[in-house]
């Protein structure tokens, strides 16, 4: 569980003003926050989030800021995230806040408007960040995935976005290569993640409703 009183103290109006000022957010900018490990293999591929937010910016003509708050496991992930943002997000401004940044000792919960976590990884189980977001008073958009299904009520706390995968039985080769030692755990996670797709139409609708 979480300490809800703690989130009450770190997500008030004054904190919001301070955090947005430090990051240089304009009053009219809508801040969409992802918090967690910044790892496209072992957490969540950012492609769907970047594509969805960029489409929402184009459709609504509202200035959006996509904020990734967390830590990179290595330089490969950092480069991949930043290069993807440069190539995909032409209308959306993208910011990265590293975990432990002294300018944001409490994260960026107070400064955000929407929390969005599109996890597509089999190692993700319960998922604490959506609960932390709700404790901070944020509407959430998450994938309809594993433990997220149990913590976010679609249309009540926010929206759950469908994920698509090949039909049952088509993952036999992936499982065999992992259990036989031909592939390591990272290879297995990457292969399954690459076989998982987020419904971008549903994501676009959810974003535009909250924006």
Regions found by a protein language model. Give the residues of each.
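Short beta-strand->alpha-helix junction loop in the catalytic core
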Residues: 1-8
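A short helix/loop element that forms part of the nucleotide-sugar donor recognition site in Leloir-type
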Residues: 8-25
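Conserved donor-binding/catalytic core segment of Leloir-type glycosyltransferases
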Residues: 26-43, 190-192
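Short alpha-helical segment that forms part of, or immediately flanks, the ligand-binding pocket
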Residues: 47, 106, 129-135, 149-150, ...
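Nucleotide-activated donor-binding/catalytic signature segment of Leloir-type glycosyltransferases, i.e.
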Residues: 68-70, 78-101, 114
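Short acidic alpha-helix that forms the nucleotide-activated donor recognition element
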Residues: 101-112, 135, 153, 171
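Short hydrophobic beta-strand element within catalytic cores of glycosyltransferases
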Residues: 139-142, 152, 159-160
